[in-house]
């Protein structure tokens, strides 16, 4: 779980070197569960309210979705810690909820977006407006993926929810990858796998890669070597954005 541009694909590239563990791409499983749950608001369900049978379907979503995957452990990427999602998972996952939370300061996330869409004409934020300010405000809208993940992270940080979570700062993942990854294995209570932290592979899981033609080329392209660098595009963030979102830090 993380805001976009926070190291999701990087973490997955490293973790997926282990043939027994799968760290997924953006997952639709929570959306499936949400859509099934909201069938309770339809006239058909309200006319015949079989909660138990619908609950059986909800409880089978993860098991059925991943039943043909060869890995023993699946790290499903999604906003698991929003209030609604957490309630659904605790009731229907069938095992304790464990969530790896990647964190990157908000302005660094937005600077990463700027670097991408200023250099990639096909990037989807370029449809949001002509100026950087317009594009960033649109990216931060309440219904977008950044805000949804941010709400999920804020909920994860509540004292009563922290026991479900392992927090990773983006900077630690890049500068100290081995102890950071080791910590995630301890959290998952599984044996450590000797990972490679150079010559990294682009994301490909079970023979499937991202199709970035949908959202803009190179959205999920990672650097093959780990190196923490200052992003010069951070200087291009408008003051209006800094004033509204600059306080969002861990």
Identify the meaning behind each predicted range.
Residues 1-62, 68, 203-207:
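PAPS-dependent sulfotransferase catalytic core
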Residues 15, 65, 89-90, 184, ...:
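Broad structural signal for hydrophobic residues in well-ordered alpha-helices, predominantly aliphatic
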Residues 26-30, 102-106, 197, 201:
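A short, structured active-site edge motif that brings together acidic residues
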Residues 31-35, 173, 246-250:
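C-terminal/domain-terminus segments
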Residues 76-195, 208-218:
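PAPS-dependent sulfotransferase catalytic domain
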Residues 226-250:
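C-terminal accessory extensions appended to soluble enzyme cores
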């Amino acid at each position: 779980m993380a805001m976009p541009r926070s190291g999701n694909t990087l973490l997955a590239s490293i973790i997926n070197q282990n043939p027994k563990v799968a760290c997924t791409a953006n997952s639709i499983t929570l959306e499936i569960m949400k859509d099934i749950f909201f069938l309770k608001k339809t006239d058909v369900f309200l006319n015949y309210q079989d909660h138990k049978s619908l609950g059986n379907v909800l409880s089978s979503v993860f098991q059925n979705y991943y039943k043909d995957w060869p890995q023993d452990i699946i790290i499903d990427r999604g906003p698991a810690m929003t209030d609604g999602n957490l309630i659904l998972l605790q009731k229907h996952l069938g095992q304790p909820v464990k969530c790896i939370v990647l964190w990157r300061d908000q302005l660094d996330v937005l600077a990463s977006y700027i670097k991408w869409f200023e250099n990639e004409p096909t990037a989807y934020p370029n449809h949001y407006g002509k100026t950087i300010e317009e594009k960033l405000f649109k990216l931060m809208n309440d219904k977008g993926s950044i805000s949804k993940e941010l709400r999920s992270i804020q909920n994860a940080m509540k004292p009563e929810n922290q026991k479900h979570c392992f927090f990773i700062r983006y900077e630690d993942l890049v500068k100290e990858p081995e102890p950071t990854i080791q910590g995630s294995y301890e959290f998952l209570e599984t044996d450590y796998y000797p990972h490679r932290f150079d010559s990294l592979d682009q994301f490909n899981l079970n023979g499937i890669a991202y199709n970035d033609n949908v959202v803009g080329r190179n959205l999920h392209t990672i650097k093959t070597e780990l190196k923490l660098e200052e992003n010069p595009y951070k200087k291009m963030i408008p003051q209006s954005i800094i004033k509204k979102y600059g306080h969002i830090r861990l």
